């Protein structure tokens, strides 16, 4: 399970150094094999260990290519999916087209989200966090049953 937000730097070749605390799990559970794709709802990237991505891929394969919305989701997620391998130094090379999509330059936030990571431009990440907090503070509608059960 991946959790927490960590500031990492992309080097001049577009590689990011994966924090040590995640490397053992990625090597043990995925042999360092990852898949990176775009997030279709936010200006960030999604980074999955290969076994987790294969579950997503299986779900995508069951969508209908005849349904325009389902086809669009397939096209966006699969069309941008790029395999990357954790190298001996614990780095991942993020494809240029993906870096460009998310506006990633040097300082990047690696955000754990249970079974995957999100990769954000640092400034965009902090802006999103502020927007999310503001949205939560202004909620006037009833919480879903699942959120009501979440006691923090």
UniProtKB/Swiss-Prot annotation:
GO cellular component: cytoplasm; nucleoid
Keywords for this protein: Cytoplasm, DNA-binding, Repeat, Repressor, Transcription, Transcription regulation
One Pfam match: MraZ
Residue ranges annotated for the SpoVT-AbrB domain, each copy included: 5-52, 81-124
A GO term, aspect molecular function: transcription cis-regulatory region binding
Record localization: Cytoplasm, Nucleoid
GO biological process, one term: negative regulation of DNA-templated transcription initiation
InterPro entries from the UniProt entry: MraZ, MraZ_C, MraZ_dom, MraZ_N, MraZ_sf, SpoVT-AbrB_dom, SpoVT-AbrB_sf
Principal subcellular localisation of the protein: cytoplasm
Protein family: Belongs to the MraZ family.
HAMAP family recorded: MraZ
Assembly with partners or alone: Forms oligomers.
PANTHER family: TRANSCRIPTIONAL REGULATOR MRAZ
Biological role stated in the UniProt entry: Negatively regulates its own expression and that of the subsequent genes in the proximal part of the division and cell wall (dcw) gene cluster. Acts by binding directly to DNA. May also regulate the expression of genes outside the dcw cluster.
Name this polypeptide is given: Transcriptional regulator MraZ
Organism annotation: Escherichia fergusonii (strain ATCC 35469 / DSM 13698 / CCUG 18766 / IAM 14443 / JCM 21226 / LMG 7866 / NBRC 102419 / NCTC 12128 / CDC 0568-73)
């Amino acid at each position: 399970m991946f959790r927490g937000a960590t500031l990492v730097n992309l080097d001049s070749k577009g590689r990011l150094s994966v924090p040590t605390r995640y490397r053992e799990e990625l090597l043990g559970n995925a042999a360092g094999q990852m898949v990176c794709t775009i997030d279709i709802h936010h200006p960030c990237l999604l980074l999955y260990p290969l076994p987790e991505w294969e579950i997503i891929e299986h779900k995508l394969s069951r969508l209908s290519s005849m349904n325009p919305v389902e086809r669009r989701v397939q096209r966006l997620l699969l069309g941008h999916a790029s395999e990357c391998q954790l190298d001996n130094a614990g780095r991942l090379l993020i494809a240029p087209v993906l870096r460009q999509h998310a506006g990633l330059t040097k300082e990047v936030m690696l955000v754990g989200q249970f079974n995957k990571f999100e990769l954000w431009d640092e400034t965009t990440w902090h802006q999103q966090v502020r927007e999310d907090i503001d949205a939560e503070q202004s909620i006037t509608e009833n919480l879903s049953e699942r959120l009501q059960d979440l006691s923090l």
